Amino acid sequence: MRDIHPVSKPCVYNCVTCKKEFIIDSAAKNTEVAIEVCSNCHTFFIGKQNATTTLRGRAEKLNNRFEAGLNNINKKPEKKKIQGKSEPRKSLNEL
């Protein structure tokens, strides 16, 4: 059982957005790998999250939906306003 481990060699990971390079030992065949987002430019790691990227739990989402449903139930439905009279319907013989 000799020589069963893969050969590891240095591989360069290039971030496409911020142009930063990481050199990591890897068993990959390529010597260069392009990645889209790294720890230098991802919003989670740099602390610039907005409301859409903030992580929320399932229970909080369920509570928000439940409260929205209760608010809709408690509202009285608005009456539709009639905007003038429309023409009476014609029968097939009249057309």
UniProtKB/Swiss-Prot annotation:
Region span, Disordered:
68-95
**Top-rank taxon, per record:** Bacteria
Q: Which GO terms describe its cellular component?
A: ribonucleoprotein complex; ribosome
Q: Does the keyword RNA-binding apply?
A: yes
Q: Which InterPro entries match?
A: Ribosomal_bL28/bL31-like_sf, Ribosomal_bL31, Ribosomal_bL31_A, Ribosomal_bL31_sf
Taking the record's annotation, the residue ranges forming a coiled coil are none
Note the SUPFAM superfamilies from the entry: L28p-like
List the GO biological process terms. Answer: translation
Q: Which UniProt keywords apply?
A: Ribonucleoprotein, Ribosomal protein, RNA-binding, rRNA-binding
This entry's Gene Ontology molecular function terms read: rRNA binding; structural constituent of ribosome
Q: What does this protein do?
A: Binds the 23S rRNA.
Extract the NCBIfam families matched here: L31, PRK00019.1
Subunit description: Part of the 50S ribosomal subunit.
Instruction: Tell me the protein's name.
Output: Large ribosomal subunit protein bL31
Query: What species does this protein belong to?
Result: Ureaplasma parvum serovar 3 (strain ATCC 700970)
